[in-house]
């Protein structure tokens, strides 16, 4: 009786394990790209490699609904019917018909292997992690929504970032000679881990910045922006309307 009871359990465990391995091993080779656009519901880890490809590690949806396309030099990763915004579908509620996001609570995890990455745009609420060092002259970052982007290490001459919404940017280590931020909303930026020459910030809203600056900080703000810094930079206030503050850490 005990053997008969154990066998179904083992069979179920093996089935689950095999299913997970299949999901983790699905890899799609793509054409060469330099720019990436990540749409909602997709958590991405970026790693530099010799082959440009996208590996699906986990997904709450059938793999065919995860779209991977390269147009020109731009790689797009999105869920079906959620290329820009998540499609809303009707459902029956106790008080009548209503609508909700098609992929409510859904998330896919992928790893993007790249050779050259110079521009990244993210839409949604997911976390994006750049595991490999970003080493180049210029890097462009655009965020829409409430996502979080983490750079483990960076070495760039110019970093230009535009944020719409409540997104977060963190740089753990490296060097950024010149960084420029344009922020709309309640964004949060922490680049204390990176040595920086000059920082220029234009903020609309209640953004929070932590920076490590050697030479100069310039702030233009409309709202209640807060800039906290390490280093001994010159402070240049541009147009400031509201309660913008600059403090040494």
Regions found by a protein language model. Give the residues of each.
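Acidic (Asp/Glu) and glycine-rich low-complexity loops/linkers
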Residues: 24-123, 127-142, 153-162, 172-179, ...
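Short leucine-rich amphipathic alpha-helices used at interfaces
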Residues: 21, 126-127, 197, 204
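Short, surface-exposed interaction patches in beta-rich subdomains
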Residues: 169-249
């Amino acid at each position: 009786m005990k053997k008969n009871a154990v066998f179904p359990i083992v069979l179920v465990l093996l089935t689950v394990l095999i299913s997970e391995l299949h999901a983790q091993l699905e890899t799609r080779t793509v054409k060469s790209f330099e720019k990436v656009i990540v749409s909602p519901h997709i958590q991405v880890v970026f790693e530099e490699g010799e082959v440009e490809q996208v590996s699906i590690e986990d997904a709450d949806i059938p793999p065919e609904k995860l779209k991977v396309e390269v147009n020109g030099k731009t790689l797009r990763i999105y869920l079906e019917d959620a290329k820009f915004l998540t499609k809303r579908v009707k459902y029956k509620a106790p008080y009548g018909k209503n609508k909700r996001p098609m992929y409510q609570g859904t998330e896919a995890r992928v790893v993007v292997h790249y050779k050259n990455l110079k521009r990244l745009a993210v839409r949604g609420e997911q976390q994006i992690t750049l595991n490999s060092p970003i080493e180049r002259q210029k890097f462009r970052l655009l965020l829409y929504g409430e996502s979080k982007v983490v750079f483990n290490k960076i070495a760039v001459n110019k970093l230009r970032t535009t944020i719409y919404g409540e997104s977060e940017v963190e740089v753990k280590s490296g060097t950024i000679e010149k960084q420029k931020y344009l922020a709309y909303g309640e964004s949060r930026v922490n680049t204390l881990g990176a040595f920086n020459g000059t920082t220029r910030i234009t903020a609309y809203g209640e953004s929070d910045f932590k920076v490590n600056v050697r030479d100069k900080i310039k702030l233009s703000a409309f709202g209640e922006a807060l800039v906290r810094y390490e280093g001994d930079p010159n402070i240049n206030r541009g147009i400031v309307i509201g309660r913008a503050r600059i403090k040494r850490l």
